[in-house]
Amino acid sequence: MNPFWNMSSAAVRKRSDNDEKIATGDQKISPPRSSSAKKQLPSIPKNAVPITKPISPSPSVQPTNGTHASYGPFYLEYSLLAEFTLVVKQKLPGVYVQPSYRSALMWFGVIFIRHGLYQDGVFKFTVYIPDNYPDGECPRLVFDVPVFHPLVDPVSGELDVKRAFTKWRRNHNHIWQVLMYARRIFYKIDTTSPLNPEAAVLYEKDVQLFKSKVVDSVKLCNSHLFDQPKIEDPYAIIFSPWNPVLHDDARERMLAQKKSEEQSKGLHVSGLSWVKPGSVLPFSKEENSLQT
C-alpha cells in the first residue's frame, strides 16, 4: 500500500489553551495510533461525476494521406478532377472518357482500334474508381461486351488491370495509365496467367483460329454499339446511326477547324528575309532607289 495512506497521526499535536497564548511551553505529542486506525480512501458515491474527461467511444479516423476526415469528400473530388485533367492533356489516341453525372467515381469510355488484330474494333467500357482513391486499390475497367482476349474475363468483361498495377501508388500511378494499358493490350498480346485461357491457348497454338475468334468478337461488339447504356446516366456515351441532317454540318465544321489549324501551323513566322526574291545568294536584299 502507498506509504502516504499509511501515514499515522504522529505529526498531529495537541495544544492546550495556554499553549496557544504562550509562544514557549511544553508540548505534548500524542502517541501513534494503532494500525487499525489507518486512513482509508472514501468510497465513490454512485452519482458522482468523474473529474477526468471521458474517452470518445468512436475516435475520428484519419485517412492515410494525412487529410482530416472532414475534408475527405473535397480531397477526393479534387483528386479526380486532377486525374481527368491529366487524361485530357495526354491525348491518348483512340481513347475517349467521360465522368459520370451521378458519381465522379465512375467514368464511361470507348476505345477505337485502328490497326492490328483488333482493327475496326470499337469497345465501350466503364472505369470504377475506389471511394478511398488514391489510397486504395487500382481502378477497375470493365468492357460493356466481353472482348475475346487473354486478359479479359469472358463472362464479366473485366480487364486484368492488377497485372500492370499490382500495388496502386498515389502520386505515381494515374488513371490515364490504366486507359493507356487498356489500349495497349490490343496491340501487344500477353498470354501469361490469362483470365481467358481459351484465347491464350489459341494465340499460342493456332493463330489463325485466334484471328477468326477476334473478328467474330469485333463484329459482336460493333453490333451492340447502338444499344442503350447499361447504366442510366445523362453523361453515358451513346452512339447513333449516321444522320446527314445532324452529322453533316458537324463534320464540316470539324474538318474546317482542322484545316485552319494546319494552315496556321504551315505559315512562316513573320520577320526579316535575308534573301532577295529571285536570288539564291544569302544576305542579298533589294536596292531601293532614293529620290532627291
UniProtKB/Swiss-Prot annotation:
PROSITE patterns linked to this entry: UBC_2
SUPFAM superfamilies on file: UBC-like (SSF54495)
Topology in membrane: Peripheral membrane protein
GO biological process terms, semicolon-separated: apoptotic process; early endosome to late endosome transport; endosome organization; endosome to lysosome transport; lysosome organization; protein transport
The keyword Nucleotidyltransferase appears for this protein: no
Subcellular location: Cytoplasm; Cell membrane
Segments of this protein annotated with the region Disordered: 1-64, 273-292
UBC core domain location: 75-223
SMART domains referenced in this protein's UniProt entry, alphabetically: UBCc (SM00212)
InterPro entries referenced in this protein's UniProt entry, alphabetically: Ub_conjugating_enzyme (IPR050113), UBQ-conjugat_E2_core (IPR000608), UBQ-conjugating_enzyme/RWD (IPR016135)
Bias type Basic and acidic residues, positions: 14-23
GO CC list: FHF complex; plasma membrane
Keywords: Apoptosis, Cell membrane, Cytoplasm, Membrane, Protein transport, Transport
Family affiliation: Belongs to the ubiquitin-conjugating enzyme family. FTS subfamily.
Primary role: May function to promote vesicle trafficking and/or fusion. May also regulate apoptosis.
PANTHER family in UniProt: UBIQUITIN-CONJUGATING ENZYME E2
Protein name per its UniProtKB record: AKT-interacting protein
Source species of the chain: Xenopus tropicalis (Western clawed frog)
